[in-house]
Amino acid sequence: MTRTLLEMSNLQQVARNERIQLAPMIEEIFTDLAPLSDKLGVTLTAEGDGIMTGSDALIYRLIFNLTENAVKYNRPGGSVWVRVTQKTEKLLICVSDTGYGIPEEYRRSIFQPFFRVDKSRSREYGGVGLGLSLVWEITNLHGGCVRVEESSDKGTTIAVELPTGAETEPSGADIS
């Protein structure tokens, strides 16, 4: 928890001017998450690619956190897809799973620090409820937006839209 809080407190100071190609980064994330996905029998699939300017370390953390959550809170034998769509000035990253879904009333709250939809399942997998808050902060710092695109008892898709251009100002989006 301390490490995550330190990461969050230092986000403003991180340079966001690196050229990032997402497909190789996603493959690295899948390799890092293979022990967990193998243990839970969750299949990981990547589709698409894109190039953007930002912080390599922060974009890695953003996609890692979304993908890790999709694996952790999935059904045994489920699937996770990470899809990247490159548009002219925007990049769309969608992480979808075949999990249990996020109730409508919690879809904005999940991006707040320390929030947990299901505290009993969260204890099983560890963490303190900062992963999606960090995703929101990183997205904001890159001038983008993050949202629950869809969610039902058949799974969830979280979409992140980021500008592809050079270092941007934080979007100032509000999650309250």
Label each PLM-derived region with a short phrase.
Residues G143-G144:
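Conserved glycine-rich
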Residues I102-R116:
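Short conserved segment of the HATPase_c
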Residues G77-E89:
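Short beta-strand/loop element within the Bergerat-fold HATPase_c
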Residues D97:
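Acidic ATP/Mg2+-coordinating residue in the GHKL
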Residues L36-A46:
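Short conserved segments within the C-terminal catalytic ATPase subdomain
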Residues A70-V71:
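Short helix-loop "hinge" at the ATP-lid/N-box region of the Bergerat-fold HATPase_c
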Residues E18-A34:
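A conserved beta-strand-to-alpha-helix junction within the catalytic ATP-binding
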